[in-house]
């Protein structure tokens, strides 16, 4: 009763491009990731249709129109909606795997429907009717089975304004977190030193002590401690961007064997090197266990503890976030030293890699400064999460 529906096109990503003056096209992937609930084309970007691929028949979007993603592997993402709040003079159409709806009877104000169709009550209804096994889908006929509450336009305006302001604050918070991450990464890349250089690009004023070259075996020792009698059941994995994390929570499954007695047992503050390489992590990843008191790791990992009289633990954890340790590995592992996703680096060779460090006093200064930035970043992430929880609470309580 609320929406009339219009045909959409099936243009795939190879028929779309950014940065031209051609008609814009909403691909369903952007509904899932990339666009806010309320789309403002004065700041949000849609791709343009590549020349020669404009559909023969189409319906231009109007402000207040909504678009739903008609398919997803996740029932929570089926019928995820966006609303065109401000077209900013642009011509836009709805594309692949979208459902284009319009309130032709003006029962709602511009900016309300996107949130109404994002509400918890609406998506509870969608989950009941979504069809499929691996891929869940809906069509416009399914909406006849769904209901949304429509309050007075005055109340709609208050609801939409509140939620839009929260969304804008979330967007600002996201940019702030991104800027802090960029700052931390830039400092890390400039404050540490490769073993083939004498100095790092960035030094703190008054710190002129020369850097020293060490081999891994000079400041750490290997851990081969086994998980006897399965004393620990927490299986860890290295996620390059998140550190040592619970394997089951991260993957939503465990790939470890039932008997964990043969796994390495590591304690909080100890390190592990994952020789698996992936995009952006050509030489694997080294992470310190920080989230849990202890955990177990496959014997494919190289685990070690450090001599804190030789190197500061926080300093080393940040050092391994940089790319400066890659040179030490590349010196012992040639281009062909990769086998089935693993770097072909022996334990002995790994502990023989060279690294260049500041004196202990400067190590602690560097670690302290980076700890302050990291704590600020974590505080801002916690605030971001609270804004998201607030929005979800309102989406649950303000709509029927």
Q: What kind of region is each of these model predictions?
A:
Residues 13, 91-99, 108, 123, ...:
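A short glycine-rich beta-alpha junction/loop motif
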């Amino acid at each position: 009763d609320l929406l009339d529906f219009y045909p959409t096109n099936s243009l795939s990503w190879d028929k779309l491009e950014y940065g031209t003056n051609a008609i814009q096209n909403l691909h369903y992937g952007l509904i899932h990731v990339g666009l806010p609930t309320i789309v403002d084309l004065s700041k949000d970007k849609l791709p343009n249709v590549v020349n020669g691929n404009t559909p023969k028949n189409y319906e231009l979007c109007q402000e207040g129109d909504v678009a739903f993603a008609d398919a997803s592997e996740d029932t929570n993402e089926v019928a995820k909606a966006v609303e065109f709040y401000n077209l900013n003079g642009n011509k836009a159409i709805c594309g692949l795997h979208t459902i284009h709806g319009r309130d032709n009877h003006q029962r709602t104000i511009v900016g309300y429907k996107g949130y109404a169709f994002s509400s918890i009550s609406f998506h509870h209804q969608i989950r009941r009717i979504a069809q499929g096994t691996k891929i869940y889908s809906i069509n416009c006929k399914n909406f006849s089975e769904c209901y949304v509450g429509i309050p007075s336009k005055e109340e709609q305006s208050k609801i939409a304004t509140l939620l839009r302001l929260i969304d804008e604050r979330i967007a600002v918070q996201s940019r702030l977190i991104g800027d802090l991450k960029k700052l931390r990464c830039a400092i890390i890349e400039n404050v540490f030193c490769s073993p083939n250089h004498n100095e790092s690009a960035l030094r703190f004023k008054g710190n002129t002590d020369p850097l020293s070259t060490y081999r891994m075996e000079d400041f750490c020792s290997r851990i081969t401690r086994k998980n006897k009698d399965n004393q620990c059941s927490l299986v860890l994995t290295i996620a390059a961007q998140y550190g040592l994390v619970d394997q089951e929570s991260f993957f939503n499954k465990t790939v470890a064997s039932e008997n964990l007695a043969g796994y390495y047992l590591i304690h909080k503050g100890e390190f592990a090197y994952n020789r698996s390489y992936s995009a952006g992590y050509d030489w694997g990843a080294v992470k310190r266990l920080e989230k849990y008191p202890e955990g177990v790791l496959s014997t494919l990992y190289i685990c070690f503890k450090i001599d804190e009289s030789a190197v500061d633990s926080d300093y080393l954890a940040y050092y391994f976030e940089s790319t400066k340790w890659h040179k030490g590995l590349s010196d012992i592992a040639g281009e062909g030293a990769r086998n089935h996703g693993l770097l072909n680096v022996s334990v002995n060779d790994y502990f023989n890699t060279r690294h260049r460090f500041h004196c202990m006093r400067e190590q602690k200064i560097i670690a302290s400064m980076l700890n302050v930035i990291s704590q600020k970043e974590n505080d801002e992430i916690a605030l971001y999460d609270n804004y998201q929880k607030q929005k979800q609470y309102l989406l649950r309580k303000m709509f029927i």
